[in-house]
C-alpha cells in the first residue's frame, strides 16, 4: 500500500473494535457488581479455541454455542472462587487466564484442523456486528431503567447496604459473571470467525485492552464502547502505516504494533484517579 486510505480505515476499524467491545461490556457487567475481572483474556481465548474446534466438527452455530459455553464455565469457576471461597479477585483472575492458556494450547496441538486457514465454518459477520454495537445501549438501559440493573449497581457500590435492602450480592455477582461469560464467548467466537482459523494466543492481549477501555469509560457502557472504537481506529491506522511505503519505510513493524497499546497506557495514565470505580469493587 503506497498511501493512507481513509475508506479502508473506516471499513476495517469496526471489525477491529468488535471483540474489544463485546469483552469490555462483559467486564463492565462483572465489575459493576463488585468483581475485579482481569480474566477477560482467558475467557475470550478459551472461546476462540472451542468455537474453532466445534465449528469444524458440528458447524458454526454449534461452534458459537460451544465457545460461549466454554467461556461461561470459566466465568462460573471465577464466581465460585471469588464468592464461595473468597479468593482474592486478582489471584483468581490470573488463575482463570492460566487455565485458559494451558487448555487452548493443548487443544491446538491435539486438533490441528482448527489452525488451518479456511477450515472453520463461519456465521455471517452481520450477526456479530448487530450484537456488538447494540449491546452498549441495551446494557445502559438495563443498568439505568430496570430493577435488575439497579440491584447490580447497588451491589457494586455498597454490598453491605444492598444486603440490608434484601438484595443478595452473591446471587447478583453470579449472574453478572454469567453475562460476562456470554459476552466474552461472543468476542472469542468473532475473533475466530474473522480470522478463519485458530492461532494459539490469538487474543493477543485484547482482554486487557478491553479492561482498560471500560476503565477509560468510567465503568459506563457508552463511553467504554467509544474507547473500544478508538482503539480499533488506532489498530487500523497502525496496520496501514506498516504497509505504507511513504510513512512506514524503514520503521520496524513492532513499533507500529505497539502504538495502540502505548496510546492506551498514556490515556490510562492521564485519567488515573479521575474516573471513579464502583465503591464496592473487590469487597465481599
What positions do the PLM features span?
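Single transmembrane alpha-helix segments in multi-pass membrane proteins
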Residues: 8-58, 64, 69, 73-90, ...
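Transmembrane alpha-helical segments in multi-pass inner-membrane proteins
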Residues: 198-261
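Short loop segments and helix-boundary regions at transmembrane helix junctions
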Residues: 32-36, 74-125, 147, 204-205, ...
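Hydrophobic core segments of alpha-helical transmembrane domains in multi-pass membrane transport
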Residues: 23-24, 48-52, 101-105, 129-141, ...
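Membrane-interface helix caps of multi-pass small-molecule transporters
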Residues: 28-29, 53, 57, 73-76, ...
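Transmembrane helix-bundle core of multi-pass membrane transporters
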Residues: 89, 93, 100-149, 198-200, ...
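Cytosolic-side transmembrane-helix boundaries in multi-pass membrane proteins
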Residues: 138-143, 157-171, 241-284
Amino acid at each position: 500500500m503506497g498511501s493512507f486510505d481513509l475508506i479502508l480505515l473506516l471499513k476495517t476499524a469496526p471489525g477491529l473494535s468488535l471483540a474489544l467491545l463485546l469483552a469490555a461490556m462483559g467486564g463492565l457487567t462483572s465489575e459493576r457488581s463488585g468483581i475485579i475481572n482481569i480474566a477477560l483474556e482467558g475467557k475470550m481465548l478459551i472461546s476462540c479455541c472451542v468455537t474453532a474446534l466445534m465449528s469444524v466438527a458440528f458447524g458454526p452455530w454449534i461452534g458459537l454455542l460451544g465457545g460461549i459455553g466454554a467461556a461461561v464455565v470459566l466465568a462460573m469457576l471465577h464466581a465460585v472462587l471469588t464468592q464461595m471461597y473468597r479468593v482474592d479477585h486478582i489471584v483468581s483472575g490470573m488463575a482463570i487466564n492460566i487455565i485458559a492458556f494451558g487448555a487452548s494450547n493443548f487443544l491446538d496441538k491435539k486438533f490441528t484442523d482448527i489452525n488451518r486457514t479456511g477450515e472453520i465454518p463461519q456465521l455471517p459477520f452481520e450477526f456479530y456486528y448487530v450484537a456488538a454495537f447494540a449491546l452498549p445501549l441495551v446494557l445502559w438501559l438495563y443498568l439505568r431503567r430496570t430493577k435488575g440493573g439497579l440491584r447490580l449497581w447497588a451491589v457494586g457500590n455498597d454490598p453491605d447496604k444492598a444486603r440490608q435492602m434484601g438484595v443478595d450480592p452473591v446471587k447478583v455477582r453470579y449472574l453478572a459473571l454469567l453475562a460476562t461469560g456470554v459476552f466474552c464467548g461472543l468476542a472469542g467466537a468473532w475473533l475466530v470467525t474473522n480470522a478463519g482459523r485458530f492461532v494459539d494466543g490469538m487474543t493477543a492481549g485484547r482482554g486487557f485492552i478491553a479492561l482498560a477501555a471500560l476503565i477509560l469509560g468510567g465503568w459506563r457502557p457508552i463511553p467504554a464502547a467509544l474507547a473500544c472504537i478508538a482503539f480499533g481506529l488506532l489498530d487500523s491506522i497502525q496496520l496501514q502505516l506498516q504497509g505504507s511505503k511513504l510513512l512506514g519505510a524503514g520503521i520496524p513493524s513492532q513499533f507500529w504494533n505497539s502504538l495502540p497499546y502505548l496510546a492506551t497506557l498514556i490515556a490510562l495514565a492521564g485519567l488515573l484517579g479521575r474516573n471513579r470505580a464502583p465503591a464496592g469493587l473487590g469487597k465481599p
